[in-house]
Amino acid sequence: MTKDLLALLKERGLFVQANFEKELKQLLNQGSFAFYVGFDPTAPSLHIGNYVLLHVAQIFQAMGHIPHVLLGSGTALIGDPTGRMELRQMMSRETIAENTRNIKKQIRRFLGSNVVFCQNETWLKKLNYIEVIRELGPCFSVNKMLATDAFSARWERGLTLMELNYMVLQAYDFYYLNQKYGVQLQIGGSDQWANILAGADLIRRKTQKQVYGMTTNLLVKANGEKMGKSASGALWLDPQKTSPYDFYQYWINLDDASLQKVFLMLTKLDTKAIETLCNLKGAAIKEAKAKLAFELTDAIHGTKAALVAQAKSARIFAFQPDTETKTVRAGTRLVDVIVDLGLVVSRSEARRVIQQGGLTINQEKVTDVEMVLQASSQPLVIGKGKKRFVTVQVIANTK
């Protein structure tokens, strides 16, 4: 017997909560229906945290349901206050339009052609402010809005009318999509629960229809820290912003405690295979991390890129010494590092080796004698010639 969709999502750690869960389960078993996920184009690329929603959309799509992707070209002009302690910087319409085009291309890679794209600027810009106050205003309780996490955390620091209206506009998005496309379910991250419920409640008040909202877990490590952040920034899905190799290496260096969670949430491996991999002990756990790195790089960048990243990682770290990785502060000059680590005896020799092409970092030749090392989540293998290698971890300078 095929496992029902909500049970599958729960098993994979992707389900947090839903309103009217019993009724939603019945609806999912009745046949194809329309659902939506939304992304505000506040950056030129989606990141790994956004991929959780895309992966859930893929699961729904594989079971015959129709994904609608809302690109928040209108709401991005305001900015979602959720999880923020300060007012977002205003973005230009030109930047938002460019980001929207880029993100739409990215999403097509994951959802293919059987997806409906919508941009909320097309209907939000037509709203008349007086009509909004008259028609939508009575449907929202300011007391309830201020009690939500998104707003309560900002109350003492100051909350603008612009930000307060974000929830109203997102709720209206759900209402509009329900009226035009028959969308019956909104899926979002767990931090969007209040906004999702506001949309479902607006539809109930305006149409007397029951619609559904569901939230997924956010991608966080076992210690609660948000995953996908590194010393060099977010883990982007755009290969120009985060290379497939750097993406691969991020998962190679994932902490052991978070391994099973990521396998379940973001890969399609069956649970028994995941359990076997995550039960590996000691040095063998590296096999599980290599499997995770390959599976995710394959899913995001394709098999060819995953194979290239895998091969590059194997080449680089085949030279990695067995000795402990050395720690270096960001901002340290490379010539000083290789002297301190004993690869050369003096700074003049260090410069000469670099100028002659005899020094590599991760098998890439170094030519800049003035190079300064930057903080990185990935270790660096520094090599002199073909036989001498040391591994360093560059950490942020907190002084």
Curated annotation (Swiss-Prot):
SUPFAM superfamilies: Alpha-L RNA-binding motif, Nucleotidylyl transferase. It is found in: Cytoplasm. GO terms for biological process: tyrosyl-tRNA aminoacylation. Its main location: cytoplasm. The keyword Nucleotide-binding applies. It catalyses: tRNA(Tyr) + L-tyrosine + ATP = L-tyrosyl-tRNA(Tyr) + AMP + diphosphate + H(+). L-tyrosine binds at Y36, Y166, Q170. ATP binds at K229. Residues 332-395 form the S4 RNA-binding domain. One of its GO terms (cellular component) is cytosol. Homodimer. Belongs to the class-I aminoacyl-tRNA synthetase family. TyrS type 1 subfamily. Catalyzes the attachment of tyrosine to tRNA(Tyr) in a two-step reaction: tyrosine is first activated by ATP to form Tyr-AMP and then transferred to the acceptor end of tRNA(Tyr). This is Tyrosine--tRNA ligase. It comes from Mycoplasma pneumoniae (strain ATCC 29342 / M129 / Subtype 1) (Mycoplasmoides pneumoniae).
